[in-house]
């Protein structure tokens, strides 16, 4: 494996320079709104690439949908880029994800001339991919909208059509494995094939040969995800061993498949689906004798679900930071429903649609009814917040303790199921330790979250004495033509702030402080209040409020969240940590200059959080506070030249400045004049556009500044 890793790095190619290359496309393009992506292979150096293209018109979109086919060769021009590193702590690592697909670079195109593409002769891969696409389109044409996405996922492994809210509900309840093709699906299909082919009179030898031929074809049809490949490879090894009259155990089969996969691509070890697939399958195989020892089906189901839940828990917490307390019981309900009704009925419906169309309407009605009510029930259960427990990402030490405790639990399970005390301790001890590690934490932190062009600052005091969020960031949404709209639009709250807070084990926010009403500061506030227990909402004491602010305040009132109007002179203390509102005065008009300005003593440093305050506000603070020393300044208004004057800087004398600003933003922030002013005053500059999230972690009165991206002064 180490040998494989050492030779997996590709030679570096000139990046960010316009170049032309001939590329073979490896699949159908994925077109979402006005965005196209497709995997390809550069023919000269055999380099696998992810090709991305922004479509310019609806006519071009239709032309690309009709013209671009797998295994075409195209002459394309664009810029080669490295996949982005995560810009926030515990964020999804897209670069590592692409390496798991053996992709080192992204090729961004400026234009795509379909006349520069030509179709080579069909191969088996191409034929299977065409059949897969035909099947997905057939489902889209025939079935109702609530049935299409799930059927495509269950038959062809195409999950991109599933609504984000439904996908999240399955994930929250720990039943996402039911809509990902895995050993369950491969087992059902292989078992049915084996039975049918034997019944029609074929010999075992012929059936084995057919299954060995069918399995790799099915892997391509099913999307070739890590869980599909694991199940197909493992089944193939077992069938092959039987063919040569050499009995191989399931544990040997899964071990061989693991080694083959890792030797082929070591980076797959980081893939969440790969980890979950192997961890759960391995645990179920090891526990199979105990599970099958139970005579009643319900006991077997309960024990199997229990083993699957326990073995997947460390990985679920590492990647998704939370789990459902009722996941085991939800699995007991939905595993039989999917195994015996929904999955078989999906395949029967699809096959009948191709062979006996007259039977289809009755079967489709039955399937639609099952899927509709199961989705409704899943959505309903997932909204019961008391059952969703946020623990955060476990440290390596905590992960190790999880593994040791759960392995000892499985070993005890092999001997006896009567030692309830041992089971309870082995199960609860790592969970309790994980919970305690977030609550009884002597370290505090101030995190400037990278939310693009906006502000969001997390202050977490030691031992969870206080958790404050100053602003939330917000995605500005512009009216788009319908053809440009994507299925699941990106948003700051759901994609950045909420996952980050959950990854730190945060369940409660003591103060949600909204400095002023601009969307790039408050746009995700409602999502935050829906996702966490917010005790207090602090807003600026202004006479006029924007519609967005009014909407947030109304939501807080309806949900019994305390609302505090911030004004000059308001202060609070938690231990040695002090917070004081310097601005605005009561009855200020609603503008950038009415931003809440907070002077804080946290972690032995004096901080000034300025919102979007401008020159007039800075002058007012200068006049009122003559001895306002600051160690770390949050530069106002993303470094705009309307703020951060020389007079203000000389008055407060910060040593470090932090600018929260979006990469290549349309406003040209930060201003060159502001940067020069900071440099001329010997103030060190940190920027979220260059450094990603910026974190000050402290213990007692000393701390260290960290950046998420490599820091280059």
Name each model feature, range by range:
Residues 1-10, 14, 200, 286-447, ...:
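Transmembrane helix-bundle segments that form internal channels/tunnels in multi-pass membrane proteins
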Residues 2-177, 495-502, 508, 542-544, ...:
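Membrane-interface helix/helix-cap signal primarily in integral membrane proteins
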Residues 102-234, 239, 511-513, 536-539, ...:
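Aromatic-rich juxtamembrane segments at the membrane interface
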Residues 164-328, 391-441, 541-543, 646, ...:
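Hydrophobic alpha-helical transmembrane segments in multi-pass membrane proteins
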Residues 180-181, 255, 271, 469-472, ...:
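Active-site neighborhood of phospho(di)ester-bond hydrolases with catalytic His/Asp-centered motifs
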Residues 267-269, 382, 389-396, 400-403, ...:
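Core dinuclear metal-dependent hydrolase active-site scaffold
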Residues 514-515, 519-530, 583-670:
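Active-site-proximal loop/helix segments of hydrolase catalytic cores
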Residues 519-557, 654:
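Active-site HxH/HxHxD metal-binding segment of metal-dependent hydrolases
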């Amino acid at each position: 494996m180490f040998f494989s890793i050492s030779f997996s790095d590709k030679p570096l190619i000139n990046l960010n320079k316009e170049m032309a290359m001939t590329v073979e496309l490896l699949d159908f393009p994925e077109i979402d709104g006005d965005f196209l992506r497709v995997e390809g292979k550069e023919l000269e150096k055999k380099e696998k690439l992810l090709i991305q293209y922004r479509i310019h018109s609806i006519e071009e979109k239709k032309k690309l949908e009709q013209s671009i086919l797998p295994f075409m060769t195209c002459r394309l021009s664009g810029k080669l880029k490295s996949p982005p590193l995560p810009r926030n702590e515990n964020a999804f690592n897209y670069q590592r994800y692409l390496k798991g697909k053996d992709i080192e670079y992204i090729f961004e195109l400026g234009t795509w001339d379909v006349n520069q593409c030509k179709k080579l002769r069909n191969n088996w891969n191409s034929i299977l991919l065409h059949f897969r696409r035909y099947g997905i389109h057939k489902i889209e044409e025939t079935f109702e909208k609530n049935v299409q996405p799930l059927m495509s996922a269950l038959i062809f492994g195409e999950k991109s059509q599933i609504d984000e809210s439904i996908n999240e509900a399955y994930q929250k309840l720990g039943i996402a494995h039911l809509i990902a093709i895995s050993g369950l699906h491969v087992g059902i299909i292989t078992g049915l094939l084996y039975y049918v082919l034997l019944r029609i009179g074929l010999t075992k030898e012929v059936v084995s040969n057919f299954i060995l031929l069918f399995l790799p074809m099915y892997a391509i049809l099913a999307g070739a995800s890590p869980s599909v490949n694991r199940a197909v490879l493992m089944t193939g090894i077992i069938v092959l061993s039987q063919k040569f009259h050499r009995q191989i155990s399931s544990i040997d089969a899964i071990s061989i498949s693991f080694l083959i996969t890792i030797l082929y691509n070591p980076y797959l070890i980081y893939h969440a689906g790969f980890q979950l697939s192997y961890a759960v399958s391995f645990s179920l195989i090891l526990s199979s004798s105990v599970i099958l020892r139970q005579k009643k089906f319900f006991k077997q189901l309960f024990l199997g679900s229990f083993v699957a839940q326990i073995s997947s828990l460390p990985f679920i917490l590492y990647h998704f930071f939370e789990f459902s307390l009722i996941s085991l019981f939800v699995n007991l309900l939905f595993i039989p429903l999917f195994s015996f009704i929904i999955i078989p009925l999906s395949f029967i419906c699809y096959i009948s649609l191709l062979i006996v169309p007259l039977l289809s309407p009755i079967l489709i009605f039955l399937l639609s009814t099952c899927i509709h009510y199961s989705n409704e029930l899943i959505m309903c259960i997932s909204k019961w917040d008391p059952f969703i427990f946020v623990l955060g990402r476990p440290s390596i030490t905590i992960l190790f303790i999880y593994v040791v405790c759960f392995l000892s639990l499985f070993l005890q399970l092999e001997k006896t199921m009567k030692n309830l005390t041992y089971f309870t301790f082995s199960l609860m001890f790592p969970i309790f330790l994980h919970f305690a590690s977030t609550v009884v934490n002597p370290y505090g932190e101030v995190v400037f979250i990278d939310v693009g062009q906006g502000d969001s600052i997390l202050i977490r005091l030691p031992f969870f004495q206080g958790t404050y969020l100053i602003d939330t960031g917000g995605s500005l949404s512009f009216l788009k033509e319908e053809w440009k709209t994507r299925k699941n639009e990106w948003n700051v709250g759901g994609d950045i702030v909420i996952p980050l807070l959950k990854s730190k084990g945060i369940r409660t926010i003591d103060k949600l402080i909204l400095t002023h009403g601009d969307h790039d500061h408050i746009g995700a506030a409602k999502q935050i209040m829906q996702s966490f227990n917010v005790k207090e909402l602090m807003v600026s004491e202004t006479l006029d409020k924007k519609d967005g602010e009014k909407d947030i305040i109304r939501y807080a009132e309806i949900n019994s969240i305390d609302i505090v109007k911030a004004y000059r002179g308001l202060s609070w203390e938690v231990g040695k940590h002090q917070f004081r509102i310097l601005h605005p005065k009561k009855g200020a008009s609603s503008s950038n200059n009415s931003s809440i300005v907070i002077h804080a003593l946290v972690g032995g440093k004096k901080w000034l959080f300025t919102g979007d305050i401008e020159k007039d506000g800075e002058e007012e603070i200068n006049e009122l506070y003559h001895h306002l020393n600051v160690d770390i300044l949050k530069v106002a208004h993303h470094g705009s030249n309307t703020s951060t004057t020389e007079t203000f800087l000389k008055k407060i004398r910060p040593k470090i400045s932090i600018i929260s600003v979006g990469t290549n933003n349309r406003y040209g922030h930060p201003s060159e004049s502001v940067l020069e002013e900071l440099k001329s005053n010997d103030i060190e500059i940190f920027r979220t556009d260059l450094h990603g999230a910026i974190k000050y972690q402290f213990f007692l009165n000393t701390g260290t500044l960290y950046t998420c991206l490599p820091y280059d002064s």
